Amino acid sequence: MKDNSLKPVSFIRSRCLRLRHASSRCTKCLDVCPSDALILAEGQVGFLAHKCIGCESCIAVCPQDCYLSNGISDKGLEEEIRRKTSGKTLKISCQRIERQQENVVVNCLQRIDVSHLAQASRYGVETIELHTGKCSECQACRNASWLDEKKIEADEFFELFGNKLTVSREEHEWNVDYSKRHFLTNLLKRGELGEQKEYGE
């Protein structure tokens, strides 16, 4: 059985703008965190690792690189994009769906930011296909408009550099292991399984 659990990110607090500059009001990571793993206490960002679900949305928005993936690193993701770019189309998949070998795989597609769009464009990519699970039912997707934001980023990139990028989405079923985990977790949240542990633990 494959392990579909996602590892928490690592937080390097010393890099945070709020710590380095008393006047900073940055809330980018707080705004996108879907699990309340990030809190604001006395003007500083706090990280509750036990609440982190590993979606890595914070990595995509933090301007100071405060968050590090415990899955694929930024450098590793860049290498995957380089290696799996074929022709004019790049396919990127959510980890929780069945995917093809040629796809770049990330924990959550909200991890993809404008720098990845720029990298793909440099390799001649004109279309980026985002292969998702059922985002509307996923705990990681607090931001329901994330796809629209990616399309806006692509349009802004075009305006800056003149390279047209089309961002499209295909929705898939979750893979079998994750579907079971998700179903039983929801039962636990409703108290229907008492003290039983989540599937797969």
Where are these regions (language model features)?
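Non-ligating segments of multi-cofactor redox enzymes
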Residues: 1-27, 83-201
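Aromatic-flanked redox-active Cys/Sec active sites in thiol-based oxidoreductases
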Residues: 13, 35, 49
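Short, solvent-exposed loop/turn positions at domain surfaces
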Residues: 20, 46-49
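Iron-sulfur cluster-binding cysteine motifs and their immediate structural context
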Residues: 24-46, 57-74
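Short microdomains enriched in Cys/His and/or Lys/Arg
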Residues: 32, 48-63, 75-93
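Basic (Lys/Arg-enriched) interaction patch that binds polyanionic ligands
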Residues: 45, 52-61, 178-187
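Repeat-unit-sized solenoid/scaffold elements
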Residues: 68-79, 196-200
